[in-house]
Every structure is written in C-alpha cells, then in structure tokens.
Amino acid sequence: MSNVSFRQDHDFEKRKAEALRIREKYSDRVPVIVEKSEKSDIPNIDKKKYLVPADLTVGQFVYVIRKRIQLSAEKAIFIFVDNVLPPTGAMMSTIYDENKEEDGFLYVTYSGENTFGSSMT
C-alpha cells in the first residue's frame, strides 16, 4: 500500500466534488479518510476511504479499524482527529460536523500509541 496521503494523491477539487456527491447520495453517512500515523509501527489499513453511518460512535468506528488492520486484542489502537483523541462515546456525525476539512472529508489518523496525548472535551 502506498504511503502517499489521500490529500497528496487527489487534488482538492476532486476531493470536494466527491465528498459533496457522497453527502447528497448518502445523507445518513459521513465520508471519512483513515490514515496511519507516520510514526506508528501498527499495520497499514487496506483502504483509506470509508462511508461511516452517522449514528456510529467513535468507539464502534475504532472497532471497525481494528478489524480492518487485523489487530490482536492485546494491542492498543488510538484514533486522532486534528491530533486530538475524540471521546469514544461521541457520534461520528458530531465529530464530522465539528472537524470536517474544507474538502468535505473527515480525516482520522490511527496509531498504536497515544502519540498526541490530549483528548477532546
């Protein structure tokens, strides 16, 4: 899998048009880009783009990521939005509304260690 980020691989206008199309077609879902932290030695994820149900919690989404990278139960995984650990009980729709980028995607970074250390309140 390429280490090129989604932003580098797709220009802004294409990303924005795609996110808009997704939101119009699937109003009950949010477009999320998931990328591994550069510093982490955790496994790579098999795909970066996800269409996440709006009512999914952050904790449930972490479970999805854990399954996609086939991470064993004893290994830790953390996800970050703008270098901040979101609350596990928060709805993905809320995190999306508060943190989506100008292109319409929510960017999530995952790591095997708590590299940033702070959490959203």
UniProtKB/Swiss-Prot annotation:
Constitutively expressed. A lipid is attached at G117 (Phosphatidylethanolamine amidated glycine). Residues 118-121 form a propeptide. The record marks G117, S118 as: Cleavage. GO terms for biological process: autophagy; protein transport. Its main location: membrane. Interacts with ATG4. This is Autophagy-related protein 8g. The gene is ATG8G.
